[in-house]
Structure formats: C-alpha cells, structure tokens
Amino acid sequence: MFGDRQRPMVLVLGLGESGLAIARWCARHGCRLRIADTREAPPNLAALQAEGIDAEFVGGPFTPALLDGGIDIVGLSPGLSPLEPALAALLAAASERAIAVWGELEFFAQALRALGTSGYQPKVLAITGTNGKTTTTSLTGLLCQRAGKKVAVAGNISPAMLDRLASAIDETALPDVWVLELSSFQLETARTFAPDAAAILNITQDHLDWHGSFDAYAAAKGRIFGATTTRVLNRDDAAVMKFAPAAGAADAARTVTFGLGEPTRDGDYGLSRDNGIAWLVEAIDRDAPDETTTTRRRKRDGAHTPDIAHKRLMPVDALRIRGLHNAANALAAFALARAIDLPAAPLLHALREYRGEAHRVEVIATIDDVDYVDDSKGTNVGATVAALDGLAQKIVLIAGGDGKGQDFAPLVAPVARWCRAVMLIGRDAPALRATLADTGVPLADHATLEGAVRAAAELAEPGDAVLLSPACASLDMFRNYAHRADVFRAAVDEIAIDKGATP
C-alpha cells in the first residue's frame, strides 16, 4: 500500500485514537516510525509501549526538524488544526520536500486499494454533516446488517478505521460493507477516498476555529465524494446542495436527495402528509421501466416528463427515534443502503427497529406528562435548532456552555416559536442572553445545571418537554458531554423521586 517505498519512514503527528491507529497500522506493515505529540506524555503513549511498537517518540512543540532523517509520509491526527502556526510551518515544509501528508482516512483508502488487488471489493458508505452523523451511521449499519450483509461501522463513531480493518484481517472476517462516520477533520486530508455512496446531512457553523472559515469547513465536508460516488444530499440545506451536480452533468444521475417536504424528482425521498399522517416516501415515475433509479435517469431523454407519484415507505410515527430531524436521518440511511442495491423490505423493518443513540434527543423520562429529553450531544447551534424544530412541541430549553465562537442568531426563530422559557448556564450564557433577548421568551440564568433542571421542571406544563440541548461545548463546566448528560439525568431522577414518579 506504500507503492515503491520499502519500509517507509512515517512521522505520526498526535497520539490520540486515530494517531495510535495509524502507528499500529504502519508498524504492522514494517514502517519505521517517529511519533510526535505536543504533550510530553500523551495518554496513549503507554498503550504504544505496552504493545511493543518500535517507534521514536518526540514530545513538545512541532517543528520542521521532525521531518529530518528521511521522513516519507506524515500521518496527521484529525484533532490537529493545520492552521495552528507551528503545525502550519511543519506542513509547509513537508510540501516543499514533496512529503505526502495523510490522515487516517487516506491510509484506510490506500489499504482498501491494496486489498483490492487480491480481490477484496467491499461496498463503502460514508456519512458526514454537522449534526446527525452518529445516528445516521449507526442506523445505516443496522440497515445493511438486516439486509444480510456483514458490516463494519467505524470512523469518528469509533473504533478507528485502521484498527477495525486490522482486526477484520486478523479474524479473516472482512466485511461486505463499510459504514464510516467522518468528521470534517478526518476529511480535510482525504485525497483518494472514493466511497460507493456518501451523504452530507447538513452544514451549519461549527469548528470554525479549526478550519478558519465556514467555506473551508464546507469544502472539507465535500471531500467525502469521489468521482463515481452516489451523492445523497439534504435538499433543505443550501450549503449541502452546492455539492449537487448541474442538471445535465454526467454524474447528475448518481445524485439522490432527501428532505422534509414532498420529493419531486424520480428516486428522491421525503415526507408526504395525508389525513394528518406523515409518511416517509420515495418519488417514483409511474411511466418508468422496472430498473434502478440511476439507470432510468441515464436512459431518459429530454422529451420525457416524469409522472411522479409518492410510494409510501412507512409512517413517520413508526420510527422509534423522535423528531423530524430523525425522520430526515432515516431517509438518508435508507437512501444510502438503496444506493448499493440492498432490498427495501428488510431495510424498512430495520428502520422500525432502531432505538437511537444516547444523548441525542433521547427521552429519558416522562414525569407528570412532561418529557425530559437529553440532547447533551447538541454541542453546536445547528444541533439545537434541529432538536427544537424536530420535537415540535412547547419546550423549556436548557442551553449554554462554551460557545466556540459561534453565531447564536439561528436560535432566535425556533426559540421564539417553540420555547416556553430558556434556562441559561455556562460561560457563554451572557452571549446567549443577548442574542435571545428580543424573542419574548423568558430567560433565566443558573449557576448549575441541577438548578436549571429544577427551575425548568417548575415551569413546564403537561405536554411540554424539558430539553437539554446546550448548543455549546461542555468543557467549561463538565469533563465532556457525557458527564453533562449524567448530571442532567441525576437531576431528573431527583425530580421523579420528589414527585413520587418512576423516571
């Protein structure tokens, strides 16, 4: 997989989960290794040493001198921003010396290409987006399993792609389908990755400190597509639809869209409402032959006007995951699985089966007809907007934390529409208050999450939801978003005990 290089020397930058996976993979293939981390003793250093991986470790600031001594490839961990001055200087020096810079995804793509020479040709599905990646990735994996395929789910969702590939090789159990959750960080260094089908779920402001601008962030998301990849795009998101080919382009037939409205193009997906019931539907051409959508589109001449009908797939209420945003995620997962020609029937059964992921618009209790919803994973504005619009009921919102420099303005309309009140916590509560001041919704500041939950419970009325969807990172008050969720759940348990209810 390293071309003509014999025992290439690889510099791995950053010893997080992906960096450790790159180091393991390179050691497995006989590479000489130098590993650098800005920390003198990163947590995974002990694991590296315990596994007996022969590598030179260098702790401290990154400098171009790390490239000396015959480095052939730089393996870049996804958590490291290429805009950070010291790293930017090192990467510029690598470019001047024509040293390749690969992330874990590029190592994975090269590995699959090498395995392909021995006849291994799996299907690869990939998912990215600001929000909904983990839910859609897990759901897509389940759909493929229920269709009878051996499936590996990896990437940003964990485990690392290279670790999962290594274990599959060792167990002689290479999967039929890879389903990969990919972050913008992972996609930034993608060069030859070309999945069979890939979805962009949405693009809203996030990680701008890492990428430098929204346009750069969106461009990284777009690297998920190869030249022949079927594109699964959210037509309700203008930033996503910039990746749609022009109508007459050669690859337009390989583009499928999904959204919350009725689809109007053959093979697209959406929602249709009839007699008060919302359905997941597929648009079909009544006059089309019994062929795949892509084949029909390729054969169609300009004179044919499709006679579009909506084929009902299942009622939205049959999904166990709450919210219209999750209906969109379900459509994306279904579209990905259909893009590799998996049969519809087992996919629809799997959609009904899926229960969702922890801390993602998860109803954890209903007390006195008030739902308590854990969306602690909602660490950016787009996630909270999706949660508010998706639940579509009166809500007492708990929000705040480390805003990461985001613009909170997109929260104004959904807060004004859905919120009975907003409880503000964390470092950037003042910025949130300033943004939401003109919504007409009562705002209250709280020093602790526990206090915010108690106050929210007092304000909520039967039929409401108390929603923890912070729109912010958690590290100003908590170890991580899971710790924040644990504190929320404990506070809800206390309310249940006080009211004599079972959470």
Curated annotation (Swiss-Prot):
Gene3D superfamilies referenced in this protein's UniProt entry, alphabetically: Mur ligase, C-terminal domain, Mur-like, catalytic domain, NAD(P)-binding Rossmann-like Domain
Pfam families attached to this UniProt entry: Mur_ligase_C, Mur_ligase_M, MurD-like_N
Alphabetized SUPFAM superfamilies for the sequence: MurCD N-terminal domain (SSF51984), MurD-like peptide ligases, catalytic domain (SSF53623), MurD-like peptide ligases, peptide-binding domain (SSF53244)
Main location: cytoplasm
One GO CC term on file: cytoplasm
Pathway recorded for this protein: Cell wall biogenesis; peptidoglycan biosynthesis
Protein name as annotated: UDP-N-acetylmuramoylalanine--D-glutamate ligase
Taxonomic path: Bacteria, Pseudomonadati, Pseudomonadota, Betaproteobacteria, Burkholderiales
Gene that specifies this protein: murD
